[in-house]
Amino acid sequence: ISRLILQMPGYMYAYSDDKIYVSHYGGSKTTIPLENGKVMLEQTSEYPYESDIKIVLQPEKENKFKLAMRIPTWASSNEFAPGGLYPYKKETTEKAIIKVNNEEVAYTMDKGFAVIERKWKKNDLVELHLPMQARLVKSIPEVTENEGKSAFTRGPLVYCAEEIDNKVSIKELTLGNIDESQAQITSIEEGILKGIQRIDLPNIKLVPYYTWCNRGDNRSMAVWIND
């Protein structure tokens, strides 16, 4: 993982003669040498916690080229990840929205990227909004271990229930008739996880899976919870 983190800057952007690819989201700045001139990009984002990404483009001169922004599977289909293993429990028609200089624009999808082609000028602002509500995920029947269970995700993050938050044995937790529309996103106010976004349900609290096992000795946790 430490090696991957150091390599991330090299994975965020790619380009061809007349096309810039934005493959990952996060605060960053880079300069791309396109065939017709250099373009500086500055990206600001709280992804993966927030759904909005902003990119300011600074071409050396007015320049026509394509900007391709990756739209993750979880934001563009009715499954959490590619492969068909983990479909969402409820389908949605929400799609990614892209604005240029505060006006919504049309885009075409090409191999997972939303592509905009236009003549760009200095200080053009691109805003990408990804649908990032809490979603219930199921497994396909072949994953027998997860039969009769569901999990919650939000954006690219998988969530889990820890016993320290729920005050009962993890084995006793059930989702029952909980609907994803009942999920409330709150920010943890204190402790080592201060600022982390939590999913609050009527009877269950969930934290991002990567934060598991950071609060005391009680390490009981579940991603897949009984329906």
For the regions a language model picked out, list residue spans one by one.
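C-terminal beta-rich recognition modules with glycine/proline-rich loops and embedded aromatic residues
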Residues: I1-Q58, S76-V100, V105-M109, F113-K121, ...
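Extended extracellular/luminal ectodomain segments enriched in beta-structured repeat modules
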Residues: E60-L67
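Short acidic, flexible loop segments centered on an aromatic residue
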Residues: R70-W74
